[in-house]
Amino acid sequence: MLRTVIVAGALVLTASAVMAQQDLVDKTQKLMKDNGRNMMVLGAIAKGEKPYDQAAVDAALKQFDETAKDLPKLFPDSVKGLKPFDSKYSSSPKIWAERAKFDTEIADFAKAVDGAKGKIKDVDTLKAAMQPIGKACGNCHENFRDKEG
């Protein structure tokens, strides 16, 4: 009886730990999807498909800033190899193999976002600010994101 209780308790603890790590993967996916949506909004404004909207620009930058602050905490060794449930993209194992390079990519993104804050006032300044942000996103995705299938 005691053995059954101990085994059951160990299984519950293990399942809880795995679920907590999967939550980090899911949070990362949500942040990336939010980034993508905001880049689409900013891109539409920059292309003249939508009118300039300072509130939308500020909201996007706020979300990018939050992502930049959260990203360093979302890739502990314990999530290596875990896949998101609802995405065709996942974290590349290179994140852990090339950690210093990955951390530099995150820092580049944070620097690009920080450089844009308070400087975007119209379409022209938006276009200028989007270039380094987009470049930082693209570099990291090219190096540290895997596509399934």
UniProtKB/Swiss-Prot annotation:
Signal peptide: 1-20
One cellular component term from this protein's GO annotations in UniProt: periplasmic space
GO molecular function terms attached to this record: electron transfer activity; heme binding; iron ion binding
The record's account of how the chain is modified after translation: Binds 1 heme c group covalently per subunit.
One Pfam family hit: Cytochrom_C_2
PROSITE patterns referenced in this protein's UniProt entry, alphabetically: CYTCII
Lineage top rank: taxon: Bacteria
Its biological purpose: Low-spin monoheme cytochrome c.
Protein name: Cytochrome c-556
Organism listed in the record: Rhodopseudomonas palustris (strain ATCC BAA-98 / CGA009)
